[in-house]
Amino acid sequence: MALYLDTSALVKLVVRESESDELRTFVGAREMVSCQIARTELIRAIAREQPRSVPDAEDLIAEMTLIALSRLLTAQAAWVKPPVLRSLDALHVATAASLAGDLEALVTYDRRMAEAGQMAGLPVASPGMSAA
């Protein structure tokens, strides 16, 4: 079983935020998976927020399994609901869904992506985030 982490979760593993400790505990030694686009999203986010931590972001990405984009995934992402979900977020949800029985949880701190994951029937987790 693997955890699919979107970029909002990956940032919390590189930059200390309020949910970082609970997320680290939740992840533990589990396999971390994401889509190839996470590399670009994470490095760009860290370069904006905390440029000195870019090497830490690169190390994190090196420890993960990154799933390549394919025609099938991009086609599936086009139909992820709701239609207001941003395109890159839809790609994350479609990629997480492609893991089927191997997915323990889609880990995200993006409320829209969490809702989309739930609509797609995926288990969703946001360790440390209040339900408010």
Regions found by a protein language model. Name each.
Residues 9-10, 38, 73, 92, ...:
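Alpha-helix capping/helix-boundary segments
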Residues 6, 89, 110:
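Acidic active-site catalytic centers that drive phospho-/nucleotidyl reactions
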Residues 1-34, 46-58, 122, 130-132:
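Short, well-structured N-terminal submotif of metal-dependent ribonuclease cores
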Residues 28, 58-61, 72, 114:
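Noncatalytic, solvent-exposed loop/strand surfaces
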Residues 2, 35, 39, 67, ...:
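Acidic, PIN/NYN-like endoribonuclease modules and their adjacent C-terminal/linker elements
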Residues 62-95:
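Acidic catalytic patch
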Residues 20, 39, 43, 54-57, ...:
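A general structural signal for well-ordered alpha-helical segments in protein cores
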